[in-house]
Amino acid sequence: MEDDDVADFFDFSKPFKRTVVSGGYINGAVKPQKLNIQTLPERAHQGTEYAEKFCREEEARLMEGWVDETLNKSTASRLEQVDDMSSVMEEDTQHLQRVRAKELMEPLFSRYNFTVTPNRLTIHQSKQDILKAIRENPVVVLQGMTGCGKTTQVPQYLLEDAYNRKEWCNIVVTQPRKIAASSIARRVAEERNCALGSLVGFKVGLKEMVSEDTRLTYVTTGVLLNKLITSKSISSYTHIILDEVHEREVDMDFLLIIVRRLLATMRNTKIILMSATIESSEFAQYFKIPGPNSLFAPQLAVSNVTQHDVSVYYLEDLEKLRVDFTIKYEQPDVHEKMYFLAAKVAVVCDRFIDEFESASTIDYKPSIIMFLPGINEIERMAEVLRNFLGDSNVNSQEQTKFTILKLHSMLPSEEQALVFTKPSPGYRKVILSTNIAESSITIPDVKFVIDFCLHRVLVADTLNNFTTLRTQWASRNNCIQRAGRCGRVMNGRVYRLVNKHFFEHGMAQSIEPEMVRCPLSNVVLKTKLLDMGPPHTILALAMSPPNLSDVSNTVLQLKELGALLRTAKGVYDLQDGDITYLGNIMSTLPLDIHLAKLVVLGYVFSVLEEAIVIAAGMNVKNIFCQLRTIEALRVKRHFANGSASDGIAILNAYNWWRSIREQGTGGDTTDWCNRYMLDRKSLIEMAELVQEITMRLKTANIRVVSGANNARWTDRERTVVLKVVMAGAFYPNYFIPTCVTDRELSDKMVYTEIGGRDPFSTVFFCGFDHSNYIGPLYRNEIRALLTERKPTSEKHQVKVEFERSTNKIFVQFQYPPDQQSGKSLYEERNSADRVHPGVYEAIKLRQLRHNQSELLVMHHNDAVAYATEHRLGVWRNHEWHPRSVEIPNAHLSVEPPIHWNRVTATVTHVEHPNKFYLRPHDEKNDNIYHDIMEKLNGCDAVLRAFPEGYAFKQRDIVAAPLPNMVTGKMARAKLLQQCLVRGVEHWTVFFMDFGLTAGVSVKSFRQLRGTPLDMFTKFPDRVFLASLAEVQPSAVRSPKDVWMEETIKHFRQLVHGQQFDVEVYSVVNRVTMVVLRHNPDDPIDLTVNRALINSHHAQLSEESYMSKMNHEKRKRVQFEMELDPMYKTQILNDISEQQRFLEDDDVDSLELPRDLLKVRLMLRGPYSPLEVKCSSTVFSGYRKPVIIEKESLNSVLLDTNPQNTHEKLLVAGCVNETSNSRLIARMTTMMPNIPGLPALMTLIFAPTCLVKKDPDETRVVGLLAGLGTDPRTGESMYPEHDMSLAVDIAIDDDDIADINALRYTMDSILHGGHNEQTPMFGEYSIESLMVKVKDYLIKILQRDRPIQDNRSMAHDFSWVKENPSTSTSSQKRLRSTAIDIYTKAIFPLYHNLNLRPMTADRMEFLRQHCKDLHLLTQSRVPLPKGGITCRLCNVTLESDHTLRIHFYSKLHCDLELKINYRR
């Protein structure tokens, strides 16, 4: 910078203008609004027009296969797969087939019953018609309503027909759900009186019950689909029956494509399509095959004759119930008044209709079922029903008694089963259900159906890769199926809460097929395995082809995940790409593609078993029950064990359940699951899925690598690596927890919002008027708001305080000490989280209560009279003054006063590096301490025991024996909490002169008060609480952000009982931040603080705003004391800092009279100053508000390290988008607190990254990650998923080299041979590569990197072409070792950074700038309006006070060190 620029910078008379400087240097206070105006480039939408060409070609190919051949009427007999017929004369072929069929089938004919017993099912009347149509046509469409018997009977008809004709048969029947395939097979086997797995069997995933005798197999759609993709043939079956085709699942539609394509060349297999809807003509048209009478496949309809009448009513039929609202049909949703209408209908059905329509088939009141679109609507409907029945005007005679039951997929199976139970006498079941009861569950006693005619469907936005559960009007077919829930055992009534005209003309006949609205990732992978052309040419042949844009976007997503290469046969193709080994594995797993990648990365990082469990748990229905309660949050946090990860909570819960089930401990697992609020059925399903995934991986030669030198993780490392694996699998679902303001200002607000209290244990309410109400009276009531179901002992650990200058109430949660084991307060806390669990639960309560809590209080006059009568204080000058007690001898306190800079002290007790006690060695304190210990333990000491039955009180001071002392040395002890141990009264005490907390029997107590030693009760503690300054647990060693036991042990051995030179950094909330030196002259690198960091037991930490503020104040006071002797004398004589007051808590024991609590206050909250929100990092989502699903651990998202200025990272397993464009992050994981982790994870796992530098190219300031640019146009390939990150750490060439080595090693493990079917390395090589993966990862995560500030780069989505000449020799060397791996790399390597050193002129300018800023703070010259910018850090400071505090930030200190500036 030129000299005149420097002069201009310090010329404060000129106006300040905040601008954004190009290239990365910006004014730190200016929000990057200009960058935010970047908008996504619009890509042309491509519809289904592309499909017409491919459909014409396919139809022509199909017709050509049939045109020259006359259909063989008896093609059910075929044995091509049994014998080679090539040498036999053509005229003898059929004869030999019949002979061989007889030989193979006759043993089965004699062993099993092939005759169908007639039954009452309606389909039996159509038996001969069905068999005739199947014999004469290659494809038949059979329509029959649910319950007609088509699924169980038609396959048996074919078995019987084969028996009668003595022909070969092999029948397969598909079912959309696993449970249906197995249960139907079991039922058919029972009907045929044969063992399951003999003549009749099933295949579900890898679970099967089949044998050589099996001729009828029920399978899931996916099983048959995978078999046909692998074999590319249908010739092994005589009949393929595709059931429930009307559901139009994506697998079924893709199966139809394959079957139709293979049918053209393999015409001897019969295809039967079975549908439950009346609109089956589209299936017939899809199979255009010449038949005896028509070009289309014939359709057969099974008559649907029922014994009971079902009446249907619409909204206009309910006018007598005062329908006073209008439905906006263009906006599908539940109108609030519809809930009340449905409640009225339910009451009318209960009170009046049953009086003249009694049900004679059952001896209790038949049920009502209501169909609602989702869980939230079910909860609201239940609330309305409860309120409706509780209204005395509506239910005055209490005639209506409902048992309200909920039914949806998130409920545990035990709760779902309640809908089948018989209600209590006089009660009627009202079942509130989603569409789960539409077809999956049948409840026979339903008489009334109340249908809101809505449902939620999954809709995929393939452009942004977000999925949305969208509320839509159900189809008429859906509503007809819902109506079929009644009328089974009695007459029924159906009430549709829409107008009849809208139902008939405004609602679609059938639901939109999944192929056009759901994610296509798995089906596109299957098209690649099918190897019959690019994905879009295959999917064009679907009954309802997806949009070409959706196919293209899905291909991009798969390329982003590494399942496809960017090129197809070496050529870049937007709509195609070669499948990788990773893609091959992903396609074989029954998982979402992100979860499949999680499993494969688990293999790469040597945590395969854990990754399989997490993936399976995320794939099945939630294993946790009652997710929206405090108890559920508590249980889930227990399983998470401080990891802040939904995935790890699933892993721990599953492992614990499995160990109990396998070892038989803990009694019945059902009781255990109930106790820990787990869904046993989901756990069993999860266990089966874990087994299936494991077996599928073994077939792909992927298994846990064993060996003497394999990569092994410690328990603490495993938590970190599992989070890393999830970050890799779920890329780019990255979210940055953000504060509303600047990070430094945010840290300040954390403390100012709660008046300087501990933010990790404090919440606050708003809306309490201290001028009208006496807050201290209602401590118990306020505690009850947050501790409703907690034991009394825990309620006493909740401290309630009031701030009269605001309308706030502060609630502070305290950790109860372990009375029996003598465990320290923090060791209790250390086992959970840094933030008190009560804070999480309080915030969750607010969410559940919709931000309001009700508090009953007295009228003002009543409260003043009551409080005055009980001598609780006095009302004076329009405010309440509670009585208080003064701490005596405050001038004798040993807490470091403001003028202390250094002190010699001994460490008396250690709990961990952030909590230990020091006894200072000055003449006054040493004399007092020795006097106390001598009088208590000297030869002349005679201590009296307390009388029997003495009533001890909290805060009493007694003499008690120190624990673990053989001599029984006595010391002063303050009573904290009472407890009983084996029936004997004990107290948890604090030893005031040692800092130790322990449980002691009252029998050991000795009196001090009222004795010659009474004065010792009036001396303050002789120790003070200390914490190592600028030190926090290592995020790699301590992923839970708490101190590990080995670190505590190491620190205890290092300091306990040792004397140190103690540098006092600050004092905040009676905790002293210190630097420990063995000798006063030791440099900073030889301090205990730095020793822990150098040994990787700890990492550097930013001090909190309060700590930096106190530090700055101390430095300023000490500096002025040196200059002004009078000021020094004043400070030395000032004891106000040590003076403490305690409010009398006796008021807590008073029970307020209920009759006086007449005023209802609605408090807002509770809130925590640590609460943060998230922002998305991808282009398509960074402007959208983000919420975390309520069931997630991180639904209460708190910043556990607000003092740190670096960004944290939250990863989501799945992201949905609501109708109002809000993103919902699901299955979330909070990543370890490692500086720069968002950038590091992106560099490791992104397909490619553009590294952005500052204008001088001296440092990295940002990353742009994604698929990169189209080599033909230079434009972003997938702009919606481009991820922009500011880099807030210093990244250098060493980092890039290690990241490249890690990416190359990962690619080496994942890269396959020529056909990419199996890894090209043997197990020994894989083992050594996995060790390298571990070593590189630990090296990357443990490296200490300076902090920097580059927030301006957070939303810069512009790609800049790189200079190809920057390719490094190391990169070229890696390429030459394995050209094939590099050209087909999933994780291509990065270019070297080639950063330039900072110029001498620039460095000198910054040093002078820092010097000027320091002089400015000492000159007392006010800063200009708008503040001043620290050019070193790019941060604007508004006042000289904030400027001084900024000097102590880690960001500023690191950069001062970088430019060699010495203060």
From Swiss-Prot:
UniProt superkingdom: Eukaryota
Reaction(s) catalysed (UniProt annotation): ATP + H2O = ADP + phosphate + H(+)
GO molecular function, one term: ATP binding
EC number(s) stated in the UniProt entry for this protein: 3.6.4.13
Pfam families to which the protein is assigned, alphabetical: DEAD (PF00270), Helicase_C (PF00271), TUDOR (PF00567)
GO (cellular component) term, any one: nucleus
Residues annotated as domain Helicase C-terminal: 348-531
Domain Tudor intervals: 951-1016
Keyword Manganese assigned: no
UniProt main location, coarse: cytoplasm
One Gene Ontology term from the biological process aspect of the record: meiotic cell cycle
Keyword annotations of the record: ATP-binding, Cytoplasm, Developmental protein, Differentiation, Helicase, Hydrolase, Meiosis, Nucleotide-binding, RNA-mediated gene silencing, Spermatogenesis
Binding site for ATP: 144-151
Subcellular localization: Cytoplasm
Top enzyme class: hydrolase
The Helicase ATP-binding domain, residue ranges: 131-296
SMART domains registered for this protein in UniProt: DEXDc, HA2, HELICc
Positions of short motif DEAH box: 243-246
Database matches in SUPFAM superfamilies: P-loop containing nucleoside triphosphate hydrolases (SSF52540), Tudor/PWWP/MBT (SSF63748)
Its biological purpose: Probable ATP-binding RNA helicase which plays a central role during gametogenesis by repressing transposable elements and preventing their mobilization, which is essential for the germline integrity. Acts via the piRNA metabolic process, which mediates the repression of transposable elements during meiosis by forming complexes composed of piRNAs and Piwi proteins and govern the methylation and subsequent repression of transposons.
Family: Belongs to the DEAD box helicase family. DEAH subfamily.
Protein name as catalogued: Probable ATP-dependent RNA helicase spindle-E
Gene source species: Anopheles gambiae (African malaria mosquito)
